[in-house]
C-alpha cells in the first residue's frame, strides 16, 4: 500500500497518508497538477520512467506521536551524524564531472550550477526506516521531513530546508535559498561573504522573475540566515496572493527545478546537469508535499 509520512517545519507531530495502489495517479506534466488535491512526489526530471506521483488521500492524514527516544532512535541518530560526517575518496568519474562543472562556471557560461552525486552505503542488519525518520524529525526541527513509498517511486526518506510552495486562500509563500555556511557553535552565522550574498541575489532575482512571468507581485523579506541541519543558508521569503488557486500546477512548473538544486540560467543549467552529471537523480531534488487548492498546501 502506498503511503507518505511527513513532518512540516514548525510542527511537532508528523502526519500519515495511505492510499490503495489502484488510486495512485501518474502525471507527466506539472501543469496537470492544476486543480488537483493529494500528496505529490515529483522527480527532478519528469519522464515516462519517472512520472509525478499523486497519492490521492482525502485529507492530511492522521497524526503520529513521536515517542520518547528509544535505543533504536539513539542508534539512528548516530547513523545520521555519521552520514553528515561521511567522507569518501573521489572516483575518477566524479572528479571528471566536478571539473566539467567548475570549467563551465569559470568560463562564465553559468552563474550557478549544482552538482550532486550518489553514494552507496550499507544500512546494517538493524536498520529501521521508522527509527531514522523519528530521529530526523528530532534532529532537523527546521526542515521538512518525509518518508514515502509507492510502487512507481520506491521508498524515499529525506529532509529539506527548501519549501517550494506553501499557503492557503489568499496567502501563499515560496523561498529563495542560496549561500551556505556551517553553524558557529550551533548558532546561525551573521557575517556572510560577497560570494554567498551574490549567489543569494541571483536566486532571489530568479524567483522574482518567475513569479512576475505569471503576473504575481510578491512582498519579500530577507535575506536572513536559516537553519539547515548542521549548516545555514541565506533565505528570502516571498509572500503573494493568487488570482486562481486552481493554477498551482502552473506555478510549480515555472519554479521547478529551483536554483537551489539546479542552477542559473535555469534551462541551460538543467540541460547541462542532465548531460554531464553522470547519473539519473530520479526523485532526488524533485519536490514533495501536500497539495490542496481549496485548503492548506505544504
Protein language model regions, located:
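Intrinsically disordered, low-complexity, charge-biased terminal/linker regions in eukaryotic proteins
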Residues: 1-30
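An anion-binding catalytic pocket shared by soluble metabolic enzymes
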Residues: 2-13, 122-202, 295-298
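Non-catalytic accessory segments adjacent to catalytic cores
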Residues: 20-122, 127, 188, 194, ...
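A residue-level signal for conserved active-site and pocket-lining positions in enzyme catalytic cores
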Residues: 40, 108, 165, 205, ...
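Contiguous alpha-helical scaffold segments within structured protein domains
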Residues: 62-92, 98, 122, 175-274
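Short, surface-exposed recognition loops or helix-turn segments adjacent to catalytic cores
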Residues: 113-119, 149-150, 222-225
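A glycine-rich phosphate-binding loop feature that marks nucleotide/adenosyl-phosphate handling sites
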Residues: 150-154, 223-231, 287-291
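Glycine-rich, small/acidic residue-mixed loop/short-helix segments
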Residues: 265-267, 272-298
